[in-house]
């Protein structure tokens, strides 16, 4: 095989891998409750090869005790046809939270986009202000591309995300009944696998 042909084949393979999407290297689960009622489990695939620092932050916070991470924290902001937001384990209202690296850490990169419903992204208050807060999209949110770091995708439990999305809200888009992460944890992935750059039904 000529050098030029080999280069062409390798380029096509690289483009094909890119089109297939990022590889899931870790999983995190959330056991969800609404108003004290169990509503199911959300399993999220995380992209540790693309955004390792962001993924490490999320995985560690999912394994910490209540009050120190995601266990016991709430989804405090829910907007239909947009997203559900949580991860503020210090104040519970969107003004708190912190990362494993300190209060805030920088935007790692914007290699991934908000391709549709079911993508996991870091909430922030502007450039390089990532802490522990995150959101899960319930629609395609292209206007957030390049502003929020995407680092995961829902693998199981999109029906639970939709149930949270549909829960009645009060002032400030806050659910009237508490939407709580009753339990959370890390699921190791022995063989990383790719996911499509598409929304979750």
Curated annotation (Swiss-Prot):
Keywords: Glycoprotein, Isomerase, Rotamase, Signal. GO terms for molecular function: cyclosporin A binding; peptidyl-prolyl cis-trans isomerase activity. SUPFAM superfamilies: Cyclophilin-like (SSF50891). Its EC number is 5.2.1.8. InterPro entries: Cyclophilin-like_dom_sf, Cyclophilin-type_PPIase, Cyclophilin-type_PPIase_CS, Cyclophilin-type_PPIase_dom. GO terms for cellular component: cytoplasm; intracellular membrane-bounded organelle. The keyword Disulfide bond does not apply. Gene3D superfamilies: Cyclophilin-like (2.40.100.10). Residues 1-16 form the signal peptide. Residues 29-186 form the PPIase cyclophilin-type domain. Pfam families: Pro_isomerase. It catalyses: [protein]-peptidylproline (omega=180) = [protein]-peptidylproline (omega=0). One of its GO terms (biological process) is protein folding. PPIases accelerate the folding of proteins. It catalyzes the cis-trans isomerization of proline imidic peptide bonds in oligopeptides. Belongs to the cyclophilin-type PPIase family. This is Peptidyl-prolyl cis-trans isomerase 6. It comes from Caenorhabditis elegans. The gene is cyn-6.
